[in-house]
Amino acid sequence: MNPDLIEGGRWPLDWRSLYPRERWLWWEQLWMDVCALRERYRLAIRSGWWEDSVQVEALAALAAWVDRYDTGEWDDPPGKLALLFELERIDALLREGAEPFHPSRDREAFLAHLLTVGCQRPLNHGDAGG
């Protein structure tokens, strides 16, 4: 998570209350987080995860949880172990869908979805890719 993107340093776990440009940034941050979580924890994320509200909420919560440990905000070894043990249950939530998630292939569909849900690309905002 990039705390420089918002005032206060933390995005909300849900995008719906944000303004259209903030929504774009929220989704872009989640995209980057999902790409990192997929690699780090070998999660079976499926193509189109952004269209499933349960998967979006699970991924946003997991990203926030991991971020708190990575930044040192939380220093709780039993809590970190709990996170690691929860990965199997979280992974089960992410198995819905036919095709595996491939960031380079799925990027255009993801960007189209952002427009569908009312996001507005900020001015001078590059493509985060994946």
Segments predicted by a language model, with ranges:
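Conserved aromatic-histidine-acidic binding/catalytic patches
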Residues: 18, 22, 26, 47-54, ...
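Charged, amphipathic alpha-helical oligomerization/scaffolding segments
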Residues: 29, 36, 57, 61, ...
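Polar/charged alpha-helical tracts
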Residues: 16-17, 64, 92, 112
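Amphipathic alpha-helical binding modules
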Residues: 74-130
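Low-complexity, compositionally biased segments
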Residues: 17, 36, 55, 109, ...
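Short terminal alpha-helical segments
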Residues: 2-46
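Amphipathic alpha-helical interaction modules
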Residues: 35-73
